[in-house]
Amino acid sequence: MQTANEIRRTFLDFFEKNGHTVVNSSPLVPRNDPTLMFTNAGMVQFKNVFTGIEKRDYVRAASSQKCVRAGGKHNDLDNVGYTARHHTFFEMLGNFSFGDYFKDLAIEHAWNLITKDFGIDKSRLLVTVYHDDDQAADAWKKIAGLPESRIIRIPTSDNFWAMGDTGPCGPCSEIFYDHGEHIFGGPPGSPDQDGDRFIEIWNLVFMQFEQVDKETRIPLPKPSIDTGMGLERLAALLQGKHDNYDVDLLRALIEASAEASNTDPDGPHKVSHRVVADHLRSSSFLIADGVLPSNEGRGYVLRRIMRRAMRHAHLMGCTEPLLHKLVPALTRQMGEAYPELVRANALITETLKLEETRFKVTLDKGLKLLDDEITRIGSGQKLAGEVAFKLYDTYGFPLDLTQDALKAKGIGVDTDGFASAMERQRAEARKAWAGSGDTATETVWFELREKLGASEFLGYDAEQAEGKIVALVENGKVVEAVHPGHQVAVIANQTPFYGESGGQMGDTGVITLGTPGTGGKATIAVTDTQKKLGDLIVHFGTVEGGPVAVGEDAHFAVESTRRDATRGHHSATHLLHAALRDILGDHVTQKGSQVGPDRLRFDFAHTKALSAEETRAVEAEVNRRIRLNAEVATKVMTPDDAIKAGAMALFGEKYGEEVRVVSMGDLSTELCGGTHANRTGDIGGFKIVAESAVASGVRRIEAVTGPAFLAWAQAQEDLLAKAADTLKAAPADLPARIAGLMDDRRKLERELAEVRKQLATGGGQGAATKTVNGITYAGKVLSGVPAKDLKGMADEIKKQIGSGIIALVSDADGKASIVVCVTEDLTSKHSAVDLVRIGSEALGGKGGGGRPDMAQAGGPDASAAQAAVDRIEQALGG
């Protein structure tokens, strides 16, 4: 029996032998495609190749692409665990032709692979074609020898694929396997086609048209091929199984789940084991590709998947977190094919454990609420949307988790009611998914990149260089010349200026027209440099001294002081990354960075704030590595060779065919395209100035080095000297001096509060009151009294007068606050809430809130404090 790993290898080897380049799976987070939440097909990474935007040095490719379908248009989450072939994570095997071979060879490759290399019985195979695709039908007859009866023509969109409303499209042909008469189901196109007898195993898409608009479809000049075959389905067929969850890849995880939970893998918890196995795969691969659980976007989909698996672990009786214990089994099965699982092992394990530990706190309470509500639901009724929303909002139950929990009991959820409850809280809720990825780049950069090619960067070795201006852009348009005083974007054939990328800010400096010594007629003050489309370096600045034209020679000079400071900060981030991993653990991975001349910012995966001891240890370790003065060296190699050599890469980052590897002795080795110090000693000192949270599971460190460190230290000295001068104390005596002042302040605050209370209550003589319409009324303006003290003062007056109404207004800090207290015997006639609103309106406010016996409000007009007291008196009939 072939294992799934062997099947994947056979597929890729077959196409490699037939002239295809084997391309690694792209990350699950699509790059430069805001239309997709997750990579869900093999062709996603080739989309720009199919449309002609991107060109590669091969015209045939094959891949095994990791895919996730959960959330958005393609969402299989609800069915996972209950059916034989639904998954949130799966692998798609595919071969692709970009204007090279077409239908005949695509069909020949497919037929030879499945019947010869995989040995599938030809008599069990049948195919579909689009109803008018005679070319494909004839190819199947000629190449595979299939009779007309086993070539089914389908007139629907099931056999016509389109990338969107416009763009490449074409007919497709699907290969089906007949599992035999003992299984219910009819052939494709028949009324019983949804049965399990005939299962699609491979889809061949023939991209031969371009959809111009709704009415117009024209032939493509270079037709292409896009195929997709699910590895899990193919493995089930080749391993003699009719259920994807019985193939070795998933069965190993199911058995690991059963062992860890001490339950039968095929017993009452069969569905739960299947859910755990599938969701472990999708969760682990998403984390490895840089997605962390959160309450929005991709992170929320990950959280939904994880929490659904955690509920099923709970159903199996697990009282401790389960999922993280299964990561080793997953790594054994898939770590060789996908080394990112091995590299991210610690991060995956810790993230799963932390999320499950947190969710367990509310899971039991939420399930108890759900059980209580189920007992109240009558026959044919649904769970109220308000209850589903409470489970979501209070207990962290995604809606689909609640639906899944009710599925076995045959109970639905009032989703409209849930949506209404969600709408009411929209102002407080986080923004819903609005896409991700890079903003669509302006057309002008695409056109210039196509025309000019990549910019040559000289800045690794030089800060000054000669070049030629090859394009000018003003106000978003390509121009031939720009006049003095105008802002311009400049592209040169070569430049020492670094374009912002990889977290490193772009260079500034001066471009001088003409060659040095010839009296340059104009300059461009460069205020920023950016990279467009990955390798087009664009200088942004203002023209000075004379006009600038395309084709002119120019001298490019980077501002060296700023570049040096930036280089030091960039090299320090590498040392910081390594130190964090050494001190906190291998789960620490970079989540983002920003490097400039003034400071560095480094975001990393870690689940809790650093203690003062950890912060000091990290800082000391970075400084130790700086003092070793190791040489900073760079090499250019393939990403695979770099990672094999021990270089750290960013999970989910897309790298080209060659990468720069920056090593600092044996202190740090990372893939990086930025500029760096020559030796670690050039960085100077390193100081952490801030540590904070960015998102769940992501921390941020801000630090300074070199001249920025010196400036920071001098600023701290100035602050210390100023504080010492203000307090008339030596800097060393400041802690004791401040502690003494704080004690004095607390003592004075207590005394002041007592004085205010005495003033409010009449200084021991009783509060000043008047009788209004038979009611004792104590109304008073208290200047400078904090709003938080008003309720306590009102309670004191209430004790004195026994029965009555109190209104106290404070005008502290230019704002007015008002408290109204009504004794219990009067609340049936007068409400404190109604009276406080009258006072608030006088203060320019908009009402207030509280109880019938005590309410509080405020307003911006402190000058109307007495008017507020008088208005309430008038309302009582005074």
UniProtKB/Swiss-Prot annotation:
InterPro entries to which the protein is assigned, alphabetical: aa-tRNA-synth_II/BPL/LPL (IPR045864), Ala-tRNA-lgiase_IIc (IPR002318), Ala-tRNA-ligase_IIc_anticod-bd (IPR018162), Ala-tRNA-synth_IIc_core (IPR018165), Ala-tRNA-synth_IIc_N (IPR018164), Ala-tRNA_ligase (IPR050058), Ala_tRNA_ligase_euk/bac (IPR023033), DHHA1_dom (IPR003156)
GO MF entries: alanine-tRNA ligase activity; aminoacyl-tRNA deacylase activity; ATP binding; tRNA binding; zinc ion binding
Listed Gene3D superfamilies: 2.40.30.130, 3.10.310.40, 3.30.54.20, 6.10.250.550, Bira Bifunctional Protein, Domain 2 (3.30.930.10), Threonyl-trna Synthetase, Chain A, domain 2 (3.30.980.10)
Keywords attached to this entry: Aminoacyl-tRNA synthetase, ATP-binding, Cytoplasm, Ligase, Metal-binding, Nucleotide-binding, Protein biosynthesis, RNA-binding, tRNA-binding, Zinc
UniProt-annotated binding residues for Zn(2+): H570, H574, C672, H676
Chain residue ranges for the region called Disordered: 844-864
Cofactor note: Binds 1 zinc ion per subunit.
Cell location: Cytoplasm
Main location: cytoplasm
GO biological process, one term: negative regulation of DNA-templated transcription
Biased composition (Low complexity): 855-864
Cofactor(s) listed in the protein's UniProt record: Zn(2+)
The organism's place on the tree of life at top rank: Bacteria
Coiled coil start-end: none
EC identifiers of the protein: 6.1.1.7
GO cellular component, as recorded: cytosol
Reactions catalysed: tRNA(Ala) + L-alanine + ATP = L-alanyl-tRNA(Ala) + AMP + diphosphate
Entry function: Catalyzes the attachment of alanine to tRNA(Ala) in a two-step reaction: alanine is first activated by ATP to form Ala-AMP and then transferred to the acceptor end of tRNA(Ala). Also edits incorrectly charged Ser-tRNA(Ala) and Gly-tRNA(Ala) via its editing domain.
Family statement: Belongs to the class-II aminoacyl-tRNA synthetase family.
Comment, domains: Consists of three domains; the N-terminal catalytic domain, the editing domain and the C-terminal C-Ala domain. The editing domain removes incorrectly charged amino acids, while the C-Ala domain, along with tRNA(Ala), serves as a bridge to cooperatively bring together the editing and aminoacylation centers thus stimulating deacylation of misacylated tRNAs.
PANTHER family from the UniProt entry: ALANINE--TRNA LIGASE, CYTOPLASMIC (PTHR11777:SF9), ALANYL-TRNA SYNTHETASE (PTHR11777)
This protein's name: Alanine--tRNA ligase
